[in-house]
Design a protein with these regions (language model features):
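Short, basic/aromatic beta-hairpin or loop at an interaction surface
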Residues: 1-13
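Short solvent-exposed strand/turn elements
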Residues: 79-80, 87-105
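Short, compositionally biased
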Residues: 41-87
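Hydrophobic residues positioned within well-ordered beta-strands of beta-sheet architectures
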Residues: 4, 74, 94-96
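Short, surface-exposed secondary-structure boundary micro-motifs
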Residues: 36-37
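Short alpha-helix capping/helix-loop boundary micro-motifs
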Residues: 13-21
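Short, well-ordered loop/turn sites that connect or cap secondary structure elements
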Residues: 22-29
Length: 105
């Protein structure tokens, strides 16, 4: 299991996934976040969307606070990927620093 910490504008979100470490999002990958399923407090599962090779956040419960700057499907790009060691759980944590993608209409 890989622990992932998503850094969005300095706010950390924690994610569990069963993927191997080399399959976590890389720099330049697109991360798609549904505002109904993002939370600072709940662990959510990172799922891969096969059709476009993007990544979607999905939560089983709808008790997460909604962040105002998220839209229905907010796209973000991974700007930096680093690793740290979690001494409490004795495993590596992948930290993804992401930035919002803005499209002008």
């Amino acid at each position: 299991m890989v622990k992932i910490e998503l850094d969005i504008n300095g706010i950390s979100f924690f994610v569990n996934t069963t993927w191997k470490t080399d399959t976590v999002p890389a720099v330049g990958d697109i991360v798609i976040v549904d505002k109904e399923s993002i939370s600072q407090f709940d662990r959510v599962e990172l799922r891969k969307t096969p059709s476009n090779q993007a990544f979607r956040w999905a939560d089983e419960e709808d008790n997460a606070p909604v962040l105002e700057h998220f839209d229905f499907d907010t796209e973000m790009v991974v700007k930096k990927r680093t690793w740290k060691f979690d001494s409490e759980d004795e495993e590596m944590v992948c930290i993804l620093k992401v930035a919002f993608l803005c499209f002008e209409e």
